[in-house]
Amino acid sequence: MVVIGAGYEGKRRAHIRMAELGARLLIVDEPGHWSESLVSDGVAVAWLGAPVVGDADQDAQAVLDALAVAGIRPDGVLTFWEDSVCVAARVAAALGLPGNPPEAVDAARSKIRTRELSAHLGLPTPRAQRVRSLDELFAAAAYVGFPAVVKPEFGASAMGCIRVDDLESLPGIYSLVRRIVSPEHNAIFRAGNDLLLEEYLDGVEFDVDLVMHEGECLFASVSENWPTAEPSFQETGLHCPATHDRKAVRRLVDLCVQTVQSFGLWSGVLHVEGKCTSHGPRIIEVNARMGGARIHEIVEAVWNVDLIEAQLRSCLALPPTIKPSRRPRSAAVNTIVHAPATGRLAALPFADRAADCVDLTIDLEAEVGDHVDGPDQVFATVLAEVTLVAKNLRRARALTADLLCNPPQVVPGSPLER
């Protein structure tokens, strides 16, 4: 199984799970990438380096060339990394291996093309327009109206996304987003740095994780997102299963399935983000891959569905074997802790365990002594992600509240004072 783009080090657990399932992994990534260590750790059988420039056609050819030189003919190709979905789709297609069509994956990868195709297909679509300059942003505002959202065409984790409420705010917001949306800030923007302005969506947001097989949805898990930290839309957390109005959630799931089917994303594990708005269900974005962070652990804990195994089987054209629990087996709360202020991180006083929980994972993203940005900088630094599983949602929430009762401590200080 060729894995194209191993992603950040937190993705190591996905590769370990694939190895546990018996997959012989060959990782293809940029020279010097951390994933080379997966071979010495016994997780992967081989690793190949291939240059990445951000153009999907060029990057796919580089992968094909590396495989040809190594004399490797894979049985399947996959990725769990957003940056690499278009490359993986092209490599699979070139080798005649299972996967979604490159044009369908491209339409999901580009938030602008997602809106254009969705509107063309007659699906309910927020107003949106491409933006390459401040003048174009003003022109787009005349079409989209306010409130609106400025976001990058290519991105993840709400990076560079910000709400705008009036014309006077446009120059400052444009300047702020432009500083973020660059390859120097994050490699994901090697794919392009165009922006879009789109209609703001009210309501409650959800993550919808789908398992598709031959165009049919076999399984859908819904996680309910908590209100984001506007104006930046940084995520604050979620819980699973969802507790929102069931009929509204069902309508959103139906729209998610209809959207991926209409796009031509007929197989594998997909991650769709949407909202139940005052005007009905709306799609925020479509990801032609499994959800990131701890989503696959959450889905397995709650519904007894292994999304990694489902994706592996799909990429090998093996029949699906998922048997979801009829009722939630447990409940999960995932909390993202941001820096409360700008300065030097003095303490992260989390408890390292919680009584009576099924599972607890704390992923630290910052260390004591680091300079951190608070909400005054719009995009606050993520300090930690806490995932707690308990017998029910009420218990999971209570245990999480106890765990996080002492907030992070930040003291005044400049980045040079470490």
Give each language-model segment a name.
Residues 131, 161-166, 211-213:
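Short beta-strand-to-turn element immediately C-terminal to the catalytic PLP-Schiff-base lysine
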Residues 1-104, 135, 366-372, 378-379, ...:
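ATP-binding N-terminal substructure of ATP-dependent carboxylate-amine bond-forming enzymes
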Residues 168, 198-265, 269, 276, ...:
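ATP-dependent carboxylate/phosphate-activation module, predominantly the ATP-grasp catalytic core
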